[in-house]
Each structure stands twice: as C-alpha cells, then as structure tokens.
Amino acid sequence: MQERYDYQQIEKKWQKYWADTGMFRLQQEEGRPKYYCLEMFPYPSGNLHMGHVRVYSIGDVVARFKTMQGYNVLHPMGWDAFGLPAENAAIKHKVPPADWTWSNIANMRRQLQSMGISYDWEREVATCHPDYYKWTQWLFLQLYKAGLAYKKKANVNWCPDCATVLANEQVVDGLCERCDATVEKKALEQWFFRITDYAQRLLDDLNKLPGWPDKVKTMQENWIGRSEGVEADFALENPVGGVDKLTVYTTRQDTIFGVTYMVLAPEHPAVEALVSGNPREAELRAFIKKVLSQSEIDRTANDTEKEGIFTGHYCINPLTGEKVAVYLANYVLVDYGTGAVMGVPAHDQRDFEFATKYNIPMKVVIQPEGLPDLDVEEMDHAYEGEGRLVNSGEFDGLINTQALDVIADKLEREGKGVRKVNYRLRDWLISRQRYWGAPIPVIYCEKCGEVAVPDEQLPVMLPTDVAFTPSGESPLTSRPDFYECTCPRCGGKGRRETDTMDTFVCSSWYFLRYCTPKDKDHAFLQEDVDYWMNVDQYIGGVEHAILHLMYARFFTKVLYDLKLVKVEEPFENLLTQGMVLMGGSKMSKSKGNTVSPEEIIAKYGADTARLFILFAAPPERDLEWSDRGVEGAHRFLHRLWRLVYAYSDQIASVPGTMVGYGKGQPNGSKGDNLFSLNSDDRELVRVAHYTVKKVTEDIGQRFNFNTAVSAIMEMVNYFYQYKDKVPAEQQNIPLVKDALARLVLVLAPFAPHICEELWQVIGGGESVYKQPWPTYDEQALVRDEVEVVVQINGKVREKLRVANGLDGEAIKAKVLEMDKVQALIAGKSVVKLITVPNKLVNIVVK
C-alpha cells in the first residue's frame, strides 16, 4: 500500500475496473428481492452542476447500499433530450439541435462516470433517439384510440419570445418559465390529453403514497383543486343570439339570495352574442381586448384592480326572481367553473371591491351570531364568516353551512340547478409549435379527416434540415417533404401534423422503458415491467411536484386501464432533495455563484465531492456550499487512508476480514467471549458495531446520510484514540482488522473509489461491492460504563460514571459519597432518593 492517498490515480483505476468488468451491469439473480432506484434524468445542457452531483450522489448511496444488502438493483440513467434550448442553440451557434444534444450527452455521460455513479450504462435511453420517440408516438396513439387525446381550438398560453404554446403549469406568475417573457392568450387548434378524466383518481390515490413527502401531495391536491358546489341557471331577461341563460358554478349557494350582479369572463362563449349589435359594442370590444392581453395570474392576483363593464343585459335570480345586471370583468377566468360568477358583494371581498367601484347594490344575507347586525351602509369589507341566513325567504334562520344542502335541493327540485363537483385541473395541452420534439403521429386527409399513423409506419421521423425562425408555426412547416404524405386509410393526399409533443410526454413513461431499453418491438415487455415496477425509490427536485410527477401518475393510470402495466402508481417512495446554495441563494450563472463539479473533482476527487455533499445537510434540506467543508471532507479521507496504512502490514498477516471479537476467533463468533476482552478492545468492538447499526438505519430507514457520515467520522476518531492510547504490542490486531473492514464497508456507498482500494488492503480480494452489508450484534453495543446524572430537587448538580448495570443501591451510595453532593445537602434532610438505572439519581431534600 502506498503511503500517499493519490485520489486521481485511484479513481481512474476503479472507474476503469468497473467499466471493464461490467460491475454495475444488471445481474437479475433468482431468489433475490428487486429494488428499482431512480433519479430524475437530466436535460443534457452540456455540463453537470452541483444540483446534479447532489441528486445522483444520493441515489448512488441508496443503490450501492441495496446491492450490498443482496437486492437485484436496477439503477439506470438517461437523457430528457428534447426541448427548446436545443433549438435556441441551433439559432445561436448554427449547429443542428441533434448535433448539439448528442455532444452534450457525451460530455455529461463522461462527467457522470467521473463521479463513480453505479449506473448500468447498457440501459441508457435518450428521448430524442428514434428508438425511444417511436414508442412515445405509439403511446400517444394508445391514448388517441382510447379517446384520451383530442384536438380543439382553445385559448392557449402563448409565449411571444419562444413562439410556442405553454401548458398552464409552465406559466409562472404570468411569465414563461423558460425565458420570463409575458405570456399572452391566443386561439389555436391544439392537442390535449384528457387528464381531467383522471382528476378524482389522481386525488384519491395520493392516499396510497405514504412514502411521498406531505408537501408534494399537498401541492398536487391543491393543483387538482376539487370543490363541491352547484351549477345554477340565471335566465337572460331578453334572450339574444340563441343565448337564453347564463349558468354559474358556485360553492356558496347559501348566499344566492344576496346576488346583486353577474360577471362573465370576456372569453365566455355567450359574450359574442351579448356584445354583437350592442349599443356599447365598440366599448365592450375594447375592454375585452384589454383583458385578453393580461395574464391569468395578473387578472386573479389579490392586488390587481378589479375592472369591469356593464353589458346592458340582465338575468334573473332563479330563487328570488330579481333582475341582476350582467358585467364582464377581468377577475373571472373562463377555464374555471363555467366562466360565469354570481356577485355577492356583502359576503365576498373580491365582489365587495368590484361592487364598491361600480356602485352596485349590496344585500346582507348572513348575519354573524353574537355580533351586531351587519348594515351595508356601514360595511367597509365583506363578511365572509358563518352565521344565520336573513333576507333569504324560506331559509331565514338557518345556519349558512346547513343551508348549503337545502338550497341545492331546492334548485335541483325546481330544475334550476344541479349539484356539481369541479376541479381546478385542466386538460393537458401537449401541442408545441417547435421542431425538437416527438412529432405527433396524425395525418389529415380531405376525404378521411383525422387519421392515426399506423404502428408499422412509426416512428414519424424528424427531418434533419429545417428553418428555425420563430413564426408561430412549427419549423416543420418549412419542410414539404415532411408534411406531404399519403393517407394510410384511402391512399389519397395527406398532410402530417407539424406540431410536436410537449417534452413532458417523453418523461412521463421513461421509467418503464428502462425495464426493457433495447427492445425494438415493444415500448416495454410486460414481464419486465411486472417484475420491476413500481419504482421503489424516486429522487428529484420538488420543482417537479406538479408537472412531471402528476403527468407520470396520469400516464401510469392510463396504461393500467389499458392493461399494459399492473401498477397504478409509478413511484412507491419519493425523496425531494433540497437545492445547493451559495451565499444563501441558488447557484446560477447569472448570479456568478456557481461551482464547477469538474473543477472540484480535479482538485479534490469525486469521493471528496460526494462525501461533502452528503455530509453537509440532510437530503431534503437546502445545502450551503462551503469550500472549507469540502477541504474538511478531503482531510477526512486522507486521515482514513493514513489509518489503514498504519495497520496495513500488521493486518496482512491476519486471515479473513471480519474476524469476530476474540484474538484469532473466526468470523461469526458471538458475545460469549466479548467480556473476556479488555475495556479498550471492548470499546473498539462497541464503536464498530454501533457505527454499522447507525449507518444501516440512517440509510435504510431515514435517509439521514449526513448523520451516517458523521458516525463514520466519529469511528475514525475513536480508532486514532485506540491507536494512540493502547501500546502497539497490546493492540488486538484481529479486532482492528474486523473494525477496519466494517468501517470500509459502511463507507463504501458514500466514497466508492477509496473504499475499493482500502478493501484490497484489508484483504477482501473481490470488489467491496461483492461483499454483503455488515451486520451488528446488539450485545456488542453495550457500554462498559454509563454516565449517571445527579440531580438535587430536580436540578442537575453533578455527573458520575459507573459500571453499566450497577444496581440502584450501589449507585445511591456512590452519589452520597461525592464531595459536591455532600456540600450541597449539608444541614438538610433527605426526603427521598429516586433512581433511574443507568441514567439518573434525584435527591429530594428540605
């Protein structure tokens, strides 16, 4: 063994060994349980960042740990490779998106391999490869045939800078999440998936995910946004253009007697009839244009001024018969409920602000109990609390929460309304007017209409030479040789769909492809997905809580219904790791606070980078980058190396690796000879077994990687104490070898390269990852001595070390002999002595 820890030579050596021997190529052995460990695959931007290092280091600890525990472990990696950045690079650098993407993949693969991550690279997938997107297209067709994919004209989120449509989830505070441009509304023919058909199942089945963070489940629950209410019909006083009523959705039917106006979203389908030929038509259309230029977020924000315009029309309250003025307003969205809202200004703050601005009457219909009666003349804000109904006809006197059902009953009985469950979730818009995505496999024929591309004609391949000028249409429209085709049904002239799919479609099923990545004839083989699914541990950022995780759950449920998979949920357990920060903020190039993983690995080694990032914070918390912390992790590995080096010659003469407790005792000898050891040797055994127990539980039960590493560091500290305290000739070398073996084995998932090298020194022969995970003996965890806290009248006054297991009377006697105790109780009478064995003595005096 060389004296100096040469991390560069060691890491290259073992990375080559793992590659040459196929160490992490999946070996599916019968009789072993399966474990599918998966980190969210990255977009191939070209370089890893520290966030990548963190998530992949976490996953690698879990995968290596489970491998050593005897599982068949599936631990794959791939690339979420379609997307707009490749097109932007094509425009900027004059390089085809495919070339840019594959070059980035090659570089990032090399970087991942330099980290020593235990991926089975034979299962690598890239969503931009025709062998992959062929099956993305095939899955689209399965949804299409099941009636879950459809095309319609819709007001969509349009990013003028990206010149493409965005899903609702890709609009953040009214801005494009990719380029921060203000998002506009635009009416286009678009493709959708009917995710709303699965809204209730997506909501209910969150209860089947105890291994998911509550925060993520709450985010999905809020995004699905289930509510229960009624749809009530307000007849138009003067029907116009075929419109004779306006239907509202409300969860507050208890306030229906307090309606004093009606509001429509400017996009509501009845608006054209109300506006056309209206004496105020020009004014109304100008207002509509103004509102449609605003983002939905801005329109509904609490601090946005509520703006509206009276249409000149009235409708009739279905329960009071009163005339209600119909307004258009910016704060009502067509996509939620029916796009029509009843205004109850006395009991809704938003309505109160609107009514105050436009001098609309208010009517109190709920009086709070135990408080002075509300008077609309004196109200400066809406009353939104509970109380008894007033001015509500036959329902006066009812508690408003009780009135919800009886008023719904009356509306249904009179045919003026129906109970309704509503969801905030909208259907998933998957069309993108971009090139670098999976082409939608549909052909349009003048004779046959919309025709699905037959399976045998998949994949619909992307052409390689297209124009990338943002125009609002897909760049594929510049290639007649792509879109001009033959109708597969009638043989006539056809035109291909030129939109491509949202990249989230590609990532909604990749975990299934990993089960059978090379199969040319199937998206995945049934027997393989039946064996591997669902994913036992999924790891990735909480920023994907709504988008990717919701879509992956939807896809899995659809495939379950189509009898293509046997699981309804894709991910059994989910870990959402925190961000890597510098100076309290997320690392980013724009802030100039990034750290290059390549530079850290070159300077300190991959094991140091991994160890620091796993030790610095619990995985679910944000991690503050620290150069000193990195240097500390590096010093620890040097210290470990020197420790093994110091014993390398002596342990070489001891056969085996873990040799048990007594000198020369074979592996597996139990506690029958434990207490024949001297106290120093017993403490070495205790520390070794405690560390195994602690690391096993911290990885296997809690994912507390930071405390596991801390326990390993403490074991090294004790080892140095043992080495310095016990004379060399009295040191129990078989026990030293046993303890070093356990130390290296439990560190192996965290720092794989150095542990491979040290395992060879200890005498392991085979790779450390061919070894079983070490066990521990509970009897070995017992300390020789324990610390007893001494209290007087409940206050801690002293501490005493006594033999473990010493009986209570003997402990009391020792406590009463202590000088400090005698001084404190002098002149007082002892009323009671309370003893908690091995922990505490409390002396009660007066």
Curated annotation (Swiss-Prot):
Motif 'HIGH' region, residue range(s) on this chain: 42-52
Similarity comment: family membership: Belongs to the class-I aminoacyl-tRNA synthetase family.
Keyword Ligase among UniProt keywords: yes
HAMAP family, alphabetized: Leu_tRNA_synth_B (MF_00049_B)
Organism: Heliobacterium modesticaldum (strain ATCC 51547 / Ice1)
Subcellular location: Cytoplasm
Name used for this protein in its record: Leucine--tRNA ligase
EC number: 6.1.1.4
GO molecular function: aminoacyl-tRNA deacylase activity; ATP binding; leucine-tRNA ligase activity
Catalytic activity: tRNA(Leu) + L-leucine + ATP = L-leucyl-tRNA(Leu) + AMP + diphosphate
Protein biosynthesis in keyword set: yes
Keyword set, alphabetical order: Aminoacyl-tRNA synthetase, ATP-binding, Cytoplasm, Ligase, Nucleotide-binding, Protein biosynthesis
SUPFAM superfamilies hit by this protein: Anticodon-binding domain of a subclass of class I aminoacyl-tRNA synthetases, Nucleotidylyl transferase, ValRS/IleRS/LeuRS editing domain
PROSITE patterns per UniProt: AA_TRNA_LIGASE_I
InterPro entries per UniProt: aa-tRNA-synth_I_CS, aa-tRNA-synth_Ia, Leu-tRNA-ligase, Leu_tRNA-synth_edit, M/V/L/I-tRNA-synth_anticd-bd, Methionyl/Leucyl_tRNA_Synth, Rossmann-like_a/b/a_fold, tRNAsynth_Ia_anticodon-bd
One Pfam family here: tRNA-synt_1_2
Residue positions binding ATP: K589
GO CC entries: cytosol
Motif 'KMSKS' region: positions: 586-590
GO biological process: leucyl-tRNA aminoacylation
Cysteines joined through disulfide linkages: none
